[in-house]
Amino acid sequence: MNTLPVKQSQLINPIAAPEVPQELQENIILTSLNDVYSWCRLSSLWPLMYGTACCFIEFAAMIGSRFDFDRFGLVPRCSPRQADLLITAGTITMKMAPALVKLYEQMPEPKYVIAMGACTITGGMFSTDSPTAVRGVDKLIPVDIYLPGCPPRPEAIMDAIVKLRKKIGNEHLDERGQLQQTHRFHSVKHGMKSVAPILTGEYLAAPTRQAPPQQLAEALGLPLPALEAIEKEAVERN
């Protein structure tokens, strides 16, 4: 007598953890998209070095074989459109401020800034009597890591990069837009007195500047208004 096989019941969503074959247990990594995104960014920071003073000389030792700047995945770039890290080292003056802001605006998001040296952070020794030094680069662009020193050692630069990598690793994709830094320029006064402009154009508009000197005009044979008036009177009398 032939009997039909009894179909055993099977749970669609079992409580127990699914079994992974042995050949796949060592080839699967479980992670989140946010962790992969942060890992890719912190392992490939491409800096744009904006050196203006003696602090930038420390990068010569940083790039050398003793400290090996490239082992952190840092590849210096010449174009701001290819960089995601801006390192400012040295004094920032009023004349250079627009260029620095333009470089920062040309960098793609997400982008980070390391302020290196006392002159970049507070103006340094130029903060007391210099009429052109900016008292802190954070009044122009937002800063993520402050690196004090005059100048900072290469070990301090490495520590700043490690701290920046930790900050990038703790960021979340959904919170990136809510963690934008506030611009300190709107809340902190620059502390500089406004001075009336020296070149107002009045000197060039003076009557003595409208006509060449008499000696020069006589040497070149140019007609002088005074001589023309005397000659005109002589002609009228005759």
From Swiss-Prot:
Function per UniProt: NDH-1 shuttles electrons from an unknown electron donor, via FMN and iron-sulfur (Fe-S) centers, to quinones in the respiratory and/or the photosynthetic chain. The immediate electron acceptor for the enzyme in this species is believed to be plastoquinone. Couples the redox reaction to proton translocation, and thus conserves the redox energy in a proton gradient. Cyanobacterial NDH-1 also plays a role in inorganic carbon-concentration.
Compartments, record wording: Cellular thylakoid membrane
Keyword Iron-sulfur attributed: yes
Identification of the protein by name: NAD(P)H-quinone oxidoreductase subunit K 1
Membrane topology reported for the UniProt record: Peripheral membrane protein
Cofactor binding remark: Binds 1 [4Fe-4S] cluster.
Keyword Nucleotidyltransferase: no
Reactions catalysed according to its record: a plastoquinone + NADH + (n+1) H(+)(in) = a plastoquinol + NAD(+) + n H(+)(out); a plastoquinone + NADPH + (n+1) H(+)(in) = a plastoquinol + NADP(+) + n H(+)(out)
EC number: 7.1.1.-
Single GO term (MF): quinone binding
Top EC class for this record: translocase
Chain sites annotated for binding [4Fe-4S] cluster: 54-55, 119, 150
Record GO biological process: aerobic respiration; electron transport coupled proton transport; photosynthesis, light reaction
Top-level lineage group: Bacteria
